[in-house]
Amino acid sequence: MTLSRYTIPILLLIILLAFGLRTYNLDKHGIFFDEKASVLVSQGMAMEGNTQKNCFYTKGKVAFTPKEFWADKSLEDYFDAIRRSDIGNSPFYYIILHNWINIFGIKDYSIRFLSVIFSCLTILLLFFFIKEHFKNVKLALLACFLMAIEPFFIAYSQQARNYSLSFFLTLLATHIFLKIVKNEENNLKKNGFYWVYGILSAMCLLSHFLSATVFLAHGLFVLLFVRKTRLWILLPFSLSIGGLAFGYWILFGGGNYTFPSLSHQAKVYYQEAHAIPNVHAGYIDPATFPNVAKKSLPIFTDLFITSNNILSNTVGKKNLILAILISILSVFSLYKYQKTRQNLWIGVVLGINGLGFLLYSTAKFQYLELVNCCLLFCFFMEYWKETTDKRQRKINWFLVILAFLPTLFLVVMTFKNGHTFGLSQRYSGFSFPYSIIIVSLALLQTNVKAKPINYIIWGVFLIQLFFVSMTIKTVLNDESFKYNYRDKARVENPYPLIANELQKMYQTGDTIVYPSYVKTFYEADIYTKNIKKSVLDAQYVNLYFPKDAEYIQTIDEREQNKVILKKRNGQKIEIFDLKGDLFRY
């Protein structure tokens, strides 16, 4: 398939846009708890110091130095750090991050930049994925643009976590999977793809355990649509590479306490969800049908950029009923227009939506977009109906499976566990590339079958993109509770600032004194649920000290917030007050 001379420049502009959005304010807001875990684990350091007993848990020893903190770690130390700080998840990501830090150091910008790279690579991969499997460059460019501005991808590309890597690897694995299916259908025996697919399955599972839902979708597709004996034989052998790697990790590596840890967490969250009173109501709730529906419906709608945030803004039963009625009438009018080509029906669409716009008591543009979503759904179904190629129809089904199965899996597990804690968009983010393709197909179908109504649909979609841009703004300003987990922006990471100030002021004979701040959420962590002394603040500061420094340091269990430099003459200088949770993100 040949590309026009404009394709590559447009693609590069999209990548540049994505890069700009993902690097904007990249280190303005300090790394939060999970990101701190990423850094510590990548260095073989368990949160709360179990792999650093020489510093924190040697009987009779009350002081330590950065040199001791940075002492060489064994392979078992790395395993223990992962099992204690991330329930054994993501070893492949930590290997990459470890080597990345060896080259670029520990700075908020550099550790997050790794995720930016994988996020931008995912956009580039999506282009080739669509070009290969849909033979449509316009579709590929539109989908890449939508991925570039998708708030979910922007938010998680700015985290030093495994998500961007996992999204890239699962899309690549899906790409290779479809190439295998295509080769088998064309009787091409290319065994190398099976090896690549198997290795990718291992990388995916060891990047995030829930990437298994993507391979579950692959298996369901084979079960429903593939009737090639050779593939049925070789694909399980290929996946056994990932299975063996995962099995080894769970049995003999840092994942050997994963399932006990998950079981412990499930019990704790269940108890909290069913407690009376429930102090975590709205965050951890019993898995009743109303609670699960309330929490899962926004996850499903936010998968599609056309309905992003729509449930947060469309409130009121009267408005919703009116929007549903207008949607039905709009779909009917569209059907009549396509049958008769009478401009009267265009007028009906414009008239009823204009009337609705006047009658909606709130969120007028969002209700217009709700109607638009219904029309776009019809156009996607029309695209499906007009797809005559059997292989392409199978891929249409595959898109739907991949778009919904990961979230459906979360819903099932939510009912199984009895609480809603794990029902989160980030755990089903593998679906986004495919939901983006679905939206792009529907939008392009309007240009084929709905002129001049397509201009109206695109116009309303552009209004939706304006609201998406507002969401992006809150993400980049660190004020999106949905994507940043907070609505009040963090300041710059205080721990490097503390380390820099201490390096300037420390003199031989001085002692650095750290606070001990014990968090109640540790109850969900099987390793630290009974902790009496926290060494986290000391760990975070020492990450930014020279590895050979010999500053004398200790921890004051009675002090919760203040980092103190105690001079050799007894003078105490307050370096920083962490103020409870205010600066401990």
What kind of region is each of these model predictions?
Residues 1-5:
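Short, Lys/Arg-rich, polar N-terminal cytosolic tail immediately upstream
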Residues 14-125, 129-133, 138-140, 145-149, ...:
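Membrane-proximal helix-loop-helix interfaces that form the catalytic/acceptor-binding platform
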Residues 459-462:
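Glycine-aromatic-enriched surface loops/turns that form tight recognition elements
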